[in-house]
Amino acid sequence: MATLLRSKLTNVATSVSNKSQAKVSGMFARMGFQAATDEEAVGFAHCDDLDFEHRQGLQMDILKSEGEPCGDEGAEAPVEGDIHYQRGGAPLPPSGSKDQAVGAGGEFGGHDKPKITAWEAGWNVTNAIQGMFVLGLPYAILHGGYLGLFLIIFAAVVCCYTGKILIACLYEENEDGEVVRVRDSYVAIANACCAPRFPTLGGRVVNVAQIIELVMTCILYVVVSGNLMYNSFPGLPVSQKSWSIIATAVLLPCAFLKNLKAVSKFSLLCTLAHFVINILVIAYCLSRARDWAWEKVKFYIDVKKFPISIGIIVFSYTSQIFLPSLEGNMQQPSEFHCMMNWTHIAACVLKGLFALVAYLTWADETKEVITDNLPGSIRAVVNLFLVAKALLSYPLPFFAAVEVLEKSLFQEGSRAFFPACYGGDGRLKSWGLTLRCALVVFTLLMAIYVPHFALLMGLTGSLTGAGLCFLLPSLFHLRLLWRKLLWHQVFFDVAIFVIGGICSVSGFVHSLEGLIEAYRTNAED
């Protein structure tokens, strides 16, 4: 009797478990995620075993056919889709293809372009996240206090994590259990997430966001160059707009850039200039340590202006749009995680110290660009280094923006909107060079008409920075790797998506209000 009762209870429990699994699987299937039950997993494993045996037989047939005389022209050639099998049904491109996934250089690189070391990749990432935008961090502390300092650390941790999971989305396990690179860019990841219903929608959204982010970064470099030169030499009869024009004239040779190798050399010089700037500013602040205003660092926040600070902090860490290209161009991609760790740790420490020390020195008088607070003699020297850093930082986002535009609009193929920018010999066509120069001039025009550094940085960070660094990587990670994620990884991804969405909306609204208010003030003056 006890055995019969135990058997019935076991059957009921099994039935309830199967029904609950079916409901959960159906719910996630409707959301677009791939959840597999135990029975489905067994089925997948069985299919993989059968497929492995089938491909082993094909390989034996191919070896036998290679050993036979070449005169047997009547033999049927093996089907390409059988040889180049890939989970998901998509065949791998033939070797030498421009779009080959494994080992591809990504959006901003290619097969025939020189590879970079982990150190060179690190200089590029450091240049992106430890760039000119550190000058706005003391302004973020002004409106955020200790919470602003916490956000500098929190943003470093989150951006390092999302950078790693974004690269993880480039890889999948093949039928033999080997991890291979099946995608080559941020756009390819987005397209894979939207397939099969909207196979190109995700790529277009990411392309637009990337172009906005990169072009706005270039604009900010021109804005800060004009601002710094104008404040360094106020006695000269040269306006800020005129200084911006001079800076743009120096940047025109960027139109001739061809690969990331040259950009990496600029990034190295730029990083060295940045360390000199940090040392000079921090040394001056330490000389006034006895006057530091610790009581001015608040535990409360300015509700209206703090969202702008969030955008500034987030934008200062944006590097995700470069990462697929950098990882694809690395000589040793296995060193990518280590490179991300030390670059973000260094950036977090330097940014936190710089922002706190600078704010303690000037407190409520802290300006949008912190070097404007320096006395005239020191300001001129520091600003010259900063201008050099801005001009050396410009090539990386400009080169990336050009590559995105060329790949999405001008690449040869049936889906290209315009003819290719390169000739058959690989040389840049004259009209392609003209378009590159036009992009440089466009950044100048925007810098002249929107010369508000901190507000523009907060707006861009809230609009595209949060999307590309927080929202999309976590969403793509859930969508593509759902079946392999542990519960804490799912929790992190969902939390990052929710927090990033809230910060993005609030920061965008308040930055836009700040720009409108700034224009009204200028109009009244």
UniProtKB/Swiss-Prot annotation:
Tell whether tRNA processing is among the UniProt keywords: no
Coiled-coil ranges from the UniProt annotation: none
In the record, the effect of residue 263 to M is given as: In a disruption phenotype model increases presynaptic release probability leading to more severe synaptic depression during high-frequency stimulation
One Gene Ontology term of the biological-process aspect is: hippocampus development
Which residues are recorded as modified (3'-nitrotyrosine)?
186
Question: Where does the record say this protein resides?
Answer: Cytoplasmic vesicle membrane; Presynapse
The entry summarizes how activity is regulated as: Chloride ions activate 4-aminobutanoate/H(+) transport.
**All ranges on the Lumenal, vesicle side of the membrane:** 154-204, 287-305, 363-383, 460-461, 511-525
Q: Its catalytic activity?
A: 4-aminobutanoate(out) + n H(+)(in) = 4-aminobutanoate(in) + n H(+)(out); glycine(out) + n H(+)(in) = glycine(in) + n H(+)(out); beta-alanine(out) + n H(+)(in) = beta-alanine(in) + n H(+)(out)
Tissue spec: Brain and retina. Localized in horizontal cell tips at both rod and cone terminals.
Q: Which GO terms describe its cellular component?
A: cell surface; cell tip; cone cell pedicle; dendrite; dendrite terminus; GABA-ergic synapse; inhibitory synapse; neuron projection
What does the record say about the knockout? Answer: Deficient mice exhibit embryonic lethality and a cleft palate and omphalocele.
Q: Which residues lie on this side of the membrane: Cytoplasmic?
A: 1-132, 226-265, 327-341, 405-438, 483-489
Q: Which InterPro entries match?
A: AA_transpt_TM
Predominant localisation class: membrane
The record's Pfam families line, in alphabetical order, gives:
Aa_trans
For this protein, the parts annotated as crossing the membrane are 133-153, 205-225, 266-286, 306-326, 342-362, 384-404, 439-459, 462-482, 490-510
**Family of the protein in this entry:** Belongs to the amino acid/polyamine transporter 2 family.
Functional summary from the UniProt entry: Antiporter that exchanges vesicular protons for cytosolic 4-aminobutanoate or to a lesser extend glycine, thus allowing their secretion from nerve terminals. The transport is equally dependent on the chemical and electrical components of the proton gradient. May also transport beta-alanine. Acidification of GABAergic synaptic vesicles is a prerequisite for 4-aminobutanoate uptake.
The molecule here is called Vesicular inhibitory amino acid transporter
Task: Give the encoding gene's name.
Answer: Slc32a1
